[in-house]
Swiss-Prot record:
This is Multifunctional 2-oxoglutarate metabolism enzyme. Acetyl-CoA binds at T1049, R1065, K1100, S1103, Q1153, R1160, R1161. It comes from Mycobacterium ulcerans (strain Agy99). Mg(2+) binds at D656, N689, I691. Pathway: Carbohydrate metabolism; tricarboxylic acid cycle; succinate from 2-oxoglutarate (transferase route): step 1/2; Carbohydrate metabolism; tricarboxylic acid cycle; succinyl-CoA from 2-oxoglutarate (dehydrogenase route): step 1/1.
Length: 1238
């Protein structure tokens, strides 16, 4: 008798065949079998495993003709499917006599069965000793088919591979066994007694059909062990491993033993219904038939089948050992599998396990609504995906919340009254897609999910312009073209460079801060693609602004900063000849390079601006810098729709927490479409590592996305999974295309993660343990992308390894070279003060005729222009002043700017209410009373009298109600165009502190930190006039505290002419340093604060001013014994008081330039008063504010022989700039004057 109890079951033939090969030639057998086969003995194994059974009665000596089979002993009634129950007798009836086989006919071919074929005979004969019965159940397969399509479509776009029907059915079988453990038992005789053995684990046997080299087929059954402990993904992995090793001949003895229940799927070859043989040692074998429509519908068309709601069926059979399993159990077991395959919970678990980012297809009854009704619902569904599809997109590479975005009611077909039965029905979708008028719901969903729910989530329906919506819709819904192999290799090369660079720095410079890009490496191929697309359009430059994270990587792999220079900065090996000022850390520095296309012939300039650690502070600076470059190129007017005008592209990188949290982001976005500020669209890339320093998103923003603020300007938003570099590249190119088509901002939100802490010394797991449990075990994007390319056959493993080794080799070579460079010891930083000196003899006076021409311009309104009746007198007065003198402050300012325009300078003037002026003093732009047509007089100065251009421009803009972004923009403009005259005016000087970060980080220290020069002018209305603490002070003390190394010029001129010369000197001296001017308010209409024409045509800026009586020789300096030093509009109050009191013993000296303090001029002026004994500094500001906190220290050092005892006259020290009461203000002001002249 066959050895039916062999531990290898029906695989015993294979083991014996291997043993024979091993015995003849051990090397012909896989080494994993050697230990088992070295002492294997088929005979002893058979004897040892032969079960102790009661021998059957002897067969007759001669075969009897057609003997009837023995009847079973009496027992319980038939159960389950009607199969008789096993007889309770332990002694089976005698086997019937076998009839002899008829002899072969003449011509028949005889073949002795050996090896596998003989083993099959043996196994099948042995199986006859197992009394079996079979249950059969037809199961709807439509849900199985549809969900498998969904799963495999998703896998195809991710890691590759497929889920088979057998994977799903096998897993369902294992889950059903948990509910029916008896199906996992098997029968065994022990010492002549029947036993039911319940194994500790479910070991699922897979019947695998193998084809040998000779073309013959053989069947092996290999087991997946302990599969009841596996989740679906683990089960699939184990399944694929068994099948792969079977195909490769790598199965081991362990794989063949211990199978407790088997699954066979003859349906793959079209078998609809099978009753497989059950081998000893198992309780059941489950057969899977082919999926077919019911026979009566197999001739129907697809359309008719869909219309009727007919689905395919799959037949499951359970052939079981009837001695230990009853028909009812088997039937319930199949029913459970049936129910499971239709259950929401079963599919939810599988979709979660495979990280499918949306809900499975649900089993629901067909909805009998009319096609007309459903057509409308299809349109609703399409609109829902366009609006909400991003909520179901698979954009989080960490998948920290696997259920958060898997569903939205609007995206559920059931919400729209549709079911799986509608998937294959055709509906009218005319106009919805660029394609046929009618489409199956399945195809509609495929387009919608491919477009909106894969690795890119798109938000664009908030855009108000239909043309832009339509353009985006057509682009994203079009079928994506797969990158070529060459393009894929190029993307991989950028990932190699990004990761290897970080790994290299981490290895070589352990513990040094660098704010690595690890976890977000896809931003490198993304930026590369965007710049490449800009080059494809033939644009002039891409200017990048970004925070410190990833900055070194961008410098190296995007801008092209030499590795040697970066490594030298890590070494601290700075070249003294390149030192400038105090410097800054390496991850704040900028650079410039040239980008050369890999797959094209164009190149483009690329630059990265310097930035501080103040997140997002660089945003408006970048925009201003780009606008300046665009204006310099003069490709067209930037305030029009001229495409060529925007040939310089700003690319701005952000962090997710900063983009949502920093108010300057909203301020900067608000500039996007404003005249005077628009740059034709910015490419925003958010490196969304889903965490602030340690703060999780739920604590850092109230919105769903960090990008929601960008909806305010109608910018399209693309959320993209950073683990899919191809998607990142596609989005980057699309973003540039949109920018070029519509000259608008585009937002790319690349979700990724931060491999390390905020910096390399930080441990993020202390505050974000769950996230970093995932991060610590996550494979990097380079590895996962490499595996995907190898898996798809696009590249070989060797090609991938060679490319990485080549890049690592380059880094190692440069590193060794840097280590050999001459090392320079650290030295104290040098001041930059001496780098720029005002040229001697600089003339700022102008010819009288130019003043007259500017005055005439204000009355040269166009024909038919209606000037407002309150403005007309102002214009007429200006012409009068230009010819007769007594020029006031506002006109002196316009004379300065107009003269610069006439001399070929670009003048840009902006601020809140700047065109008219906060105090209705400027009227630089005249508005027609009826038509709102605008007339700008100073623009007439852009041409000479003969009509030829001067080369100058006058650009004046009302800014948005913003300080931070507005000041940053103007600073950036001066960096981009150093020759421009750029002025920003605060509404009141008090409000400039809204831009304090720009002042601290850029204006006052940009030169010392980065060598970045600026000549921006800040005009800050300042003065105590009883208007309260928020309309009084431009905070002189703060600017003086920031001043050092000649970093700025700070002035508070007291005459219109001195202001005129100050502005002209600043524009013409060739020095690139900011100018801070504290301008007047009430003094704008002070009849004493005027200047004569000769003050504009004969002199220049004077940093120290005496009273005119002394300058004219009327006053006697020898009578003076008290000198009152002062600055600003209080001078006029002091002069009036002096005249009233007839105090010839008191002289008033004005310090017009507060910093740098004019030491020589001040010394010369004071020396003219030989009898002066008392020196006072008089200011309106409180004692702890204004110029005194600095001057109280600096004046005694300047002139110790005269000013060592200088005293202060001012308001008391105050926490606010002034009193809120105008009456208290008047008392305090009088007290200052009384003390000064007391």
């Amino acid at each position: 008798m066959a050895n039916i109890s062999s531990p290898f079951g029906q695989n015993e033939w294979l083991v014996e065949e291997m043993y024979r090969k091993f015995r003849d030639d051990p090397s012909s057998v896989d080494p994993s079998w050697h230990e088992f086969l070295v002492d294997y003995n088929p005979e002893s194994t058979q004897e040892a495993t032969e079960p102790a059974v009661v021998k059957p009665a002897a067969a007759p000596a001669k075969p009897a003709p057609a003997p009837a089979p023995a009847k079973p002993a009496a027992g319980p009634p038939a159960a389950g499917n009607g199969s008789p129950a096993a007889a309770p007798s332990a002694k089976p009836a005698a086997a019937p006599a076998k009839a002899p086989a008829p002899p072969p006919a003449e011509g028949d071919e005889m073949q002795v069965l050996r090896g596998a074929a003989a083993a099959v005979v043996k196994n099948m004969s042995a199986s006859l000793d197992v009394p079996t019965a079979t249950s059969v159940r037809a199961v709807p397969a439509k849900l199985l088919i549809d969900n498998r399509i969904v799963i495999n479509n998703q896998l195809k776009r991710n890691r590759g591979g497929k889920i088979s029907f057998t994977h799903l059915l096998g897993y369902a079988l294992v889950q059903a066994v948990k509910k029916f453990p008896n199906m996992n038992r098997h029968y065994l005789d022990v010492d002549g007694k029947p036993n039911a053995v319940t194994p500790a684990h479910t070991n699922l046997g897979l019947a695998i059909d193998l084809q040998g080299k000779d073309g013959k087929r053989a069947l092996v059954v290999a087991g997946i062990k302990r599969c009841e402990t596996m989740r679906f993904a683990q089960f699939v992995t184990a399944y694929e491993d068994i099948v792969r090793r079977a195909r490769d001949g790598k199965l081991t003895a362990e794989d063949f033993s211990g199978v407790t229940i088997s699954l066979t799927n003859p349906g793959t070859i079209g078998t609809v219904h099978s009753v497989p043989r059950l081998m000893a040692g198992q309780g059941a074998i489950i057969g899977v038939g082919a999926m077919e429509y019911p026979a009566e519908f197999q001739g129907a068309s697809e359309e008719r089948i869909a219309e009727l709601g007919i689905g395919k069926l799959i037949t499951l059979t359970s052939t079981y050992d009837h001695r230990i399993i009853q028909g009812a159990e088997s039937g319930d077991f199949l029913r459970t599998i049936h129910q499971m395959l239709l259950a929401d919970e079963f599919w939810d678990e599988i979709f979660r396990e495979l990280s499918i980012p949306y809900l499975p297809v649900r089993w629901r009854p067909d909805n009998p609504d009319s096609i007309v009704d459903k057509n409308a619902r299809i349109i609703e569904l399409i609109a829902a995906y366009r609006n909400r599809g991003h909520l179901m997109a698979d954009i989080d590479p960490l998948r920290l919340d696997k259920t958060r975005f898997r569903s939205h009611p609007d995206l559920d077909v059931c919400t729209h009254g549709l079911t799986l039965w509608d998937l294959d029905r055709s509906f009218k979708v005319g106009g919805c897609f660029a394609g046929p008028q009618n489409m199956k719901l399945r195809d509609v969903l495929s387009i919608l999910r491919d477009t909106y729910c894969r690795h890119v989530g798109v938000e664009y329906t908030h855009i108000l312009e239909p043309e832009q919506q339509q353009w985006l819709q057509q682009r994203v819904e079009a079928k994506h073209v797969k990158p070529t192999v060459a393009q894929q290799k190029y993307v991989l090369s950028k990932l190699n460079a990004a990761e290897a660079f970080e790994t290299f720095l981490q290895t070589k410079y352990v513990g040094q801060k660098r704010f690595s890009l690890e976890g977000a490496e896809s931003v490198i191929p993304m930026m590369d693609a965007a710049i490449d697309q800009c080059a494809e359009y033939g644009l002039d430059e891409v200017v990048i602004g970004m925070p410190h994270r990833g900055r070194l990587n961008v410098l190296a792999n995007i801008v092209g900063k030499p590795y040697s220079q970066i490594f030298s900065e890590f070494e601290g090996n700075l070249n003294p000849s390149q030192a400038h000022g105090s410097g800054d850390v390496k991850y704040h520095l900028g650079a410039t390079g040239v980008y050369l296309q890999m797959f094209g012939d164009n190149d483009i300039q690329v630059s990265l601006t310097a930035n501080p650690s103040h997140l997002e502070a660089v945003d408006p600076v970048l925009e201003g810098l780009v606008r300046a470059k665009q204006d310099l190129l003069e490709h067209g007017e930037t305030d029009t729709e001229n495409q060529r005008a925007f040939s310089v592209v700003p690319m701005m990188l952000h962090g997710d927490a900063a983009f949502a949290g920093q108010g300057v982001v909203a301020e900067t976005l608000n500039l996007a479409n404003l005249p005077g500020y628009r740059v034709g669209g910015t490419i925003h890339i958010i490196v969304n590592n889903q965490i602030g320093f340690t703060t999780a998103p739920e604590y850092s923003r109230s919105t769903e996305y960090c990008t929601d603020v960008a909806k305010t300007i109608g910018a399209p938003i693309f959320h993209v999974n950073g683990d899919d570099p191809e998607a990142c590249v596609w989005v980057a190119r699309l973003a540039v295309d949109f920018r070029q088509r519509f000259n608008k901002d585009v937002i790319i939100d690349m979700l990724c993660y931060r491999r390390r802490g905020h910096n390399e010394g930080d441990d993020p797991s202390m505050t974000n343990p769950r996230m970093y449990d995932v991060v610590d075990t996550k494979r990097g994007v380079r590895k996962s992308y490499t595996e995907a390319l190898i898996g798809r056959g696009d590249i070989s493993i060797k090609e991938a390894e060679d490319a990485l080794r080549d890049y690592q080799g380059q880094l190692e070579q440069v590193f060794n070279e840097v280590r050999e460079l001459e090392k320079h010891g650290a030295q104290p930083s040098e001041s930059v003060e001496s780098d720029q000196m005002i040229p001697a003899g600089l003339a700022t006076a102008v010819d009288k005729s130019l003043l007259a021409r500017i005055g005439d311009a204000f009355l040269a309104v166009p024909d038919g222009f209606t000037t407002h009746p309150r403005v007309q007198p102002v214009l007429e007065k200006r012409r009068e002043m230009a010819y007769e003198g007594k020029i006031d402050w506002a006109f002196a300012e316009l004379l300065a700017l107009g003269s610069l325009v006439a001399e070929g300078k670009l003048v840009r003037f902006s601020g809140q209410d700047t065109r008219r002026g906060t105090f209705s003093q400027r009227h630089s732009v005249i508005i027609d009373r009826h038509t709102r047509e605008e007339f700008t007089p100073l623009q007439l100065l852009t041409t000479n009298k003969d009509g030829s251009p001067t080369g100058g421009k006058f650009l004046v803009y009302d800014s948005p109600l913003s300080e931070y972004a507005a000041v940053g923009f103007e600073y950036g403009y001066t960096v981009g165009n150093p020759d421009a005259v750029v002025l920003w005016e605060a509404q009141f000087g008090d409000f400039v502190n809204g831009a304090q970060s720009i002042i601290d980080e850029f204006i006052s220290s940009g030169e010392a930190k980065w060598g970045q020069l600026s000549n921006v002018v800040l005009l800050l209305p300042h003065g105590h006039e009883g208007q309260g603490p928020d309309h009084t002070s431009g905070r002189i003390e703060r600017f003086l505290q920031l001043w050092a190394e000649g970093s700025m010029t700070i002035a508070m001129p007291s005459t219109p002419s001195n202001y005129f010369h100050l502005l002209r000197r600043h524009a013409l001296d060739g020095i690139q340093r900011p100018l801070i001017v504290f301008t007047p308010k009430s003094m704008l209409r002070n009849k004493a604060a005027v200047s004569d024409i000769k003050d504009f045509t004969e002199i220049k800026f004077r940093s120290v001013l005496e009273e005119p009586t002394y300058e004219d020789g009327v006053g006697d300096r020898n009578l003076v014994n008290r000198i009152l030093l002062t600055s600003g509009k209080i001078y006029y109050e002091m002069v009036a008081r002096k005249a009233k009191d007839k105090r010839e013993d008191v002289a008033i000296v004005r310090v017009e330039q507060l910093a740098p303090l004019p030491r020589r001029r001040l010394r010369e002026t004071l020396d003219r008063y030989p009898n002066a004994k008392e020196f006072f500094w008089v200011q309106e500001e409180p004692a702890n504010q204004g110029a005194w906190p600095r001057f109280g220290l600096e004046l005694p050092e300047l002139l110790p022989e005269k000013l060592s005892g200088v005293k202060r006259i001012s308001r008391r020290a105050m926490s606010a700039p002034s009193s809120g009461s105008s009456k208290v203000h008047a008392v305090e002001q009088q007290e200052i004057l009384d003390t000064a002249f007391g």
